[in-house]
């Protein structure tokens, strides 16, 4: 498993905190832990960024994960014990995405997570050289969050 670090830069221009997590990247797939620290704990209930070979429109796959109640929060959803998220993924397109570091060819994935407490979604934009460069989330409370690449160091 590769480790990666991400830093959070609000409009103020300085990092408020950073975090390290993991990525599995091999000839079959790329899978990464979502941002799940502090304000981003809600993303544990969303589909994880994940793309699987073959990279072609219409490719579908599934998996599931148990999620303990230590991820609950009164601000979005509470439950007792463990829930099971069932994930469905599909490559729905390929497009040129304009980012802050240039235009990138991206595979577009659409995914959902469904459990006893509700459903969430993710549209992921995956560039074969740089990985996931944009993530559009619909959260369990129906709020939306977009995470985009800003720079590569």
Annotate each PLM feature:
Residues 1-80, 108-117, 125-127:
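Signature of exported/secreted
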Residues 1, 6-8, 70-153:
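Acidic, serine/threonine-rich low-complexity disordered tracts
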């Amino acid at each position: 498993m590769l480790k990666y670090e991400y830093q959070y830069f609000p409009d103020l221009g300085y990092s408020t905190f950073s975090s390290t997590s993991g990525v599995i990247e091999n000839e079959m797939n790329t899978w990464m832990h979502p941002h799940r620290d502090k304000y981003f704990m809600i993303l544990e209930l969303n589909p994880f960024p994940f793309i699987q070979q073959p990279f072609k429109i219409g490719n579908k796959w599934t998996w599931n994960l148990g999620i303990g109640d230590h991820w609950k929060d009164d601000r979005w959803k509470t439950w007792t014990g463990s829930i099971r998220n069932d994930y469905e993924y599909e490559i729905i397109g390929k497009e040129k995405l304009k980012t802050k570091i240039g235009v990138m060819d991206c595979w577009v994935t659409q995914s959902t997570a469904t459990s006893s407490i509700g459903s969430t979604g993710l549209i992921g934009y995956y560039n074969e050289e740089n990985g996931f460069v944009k993530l559009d989330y619909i959260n369990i409370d129906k709020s939306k969050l977009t995470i985009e690449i800003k720079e590569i160091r």
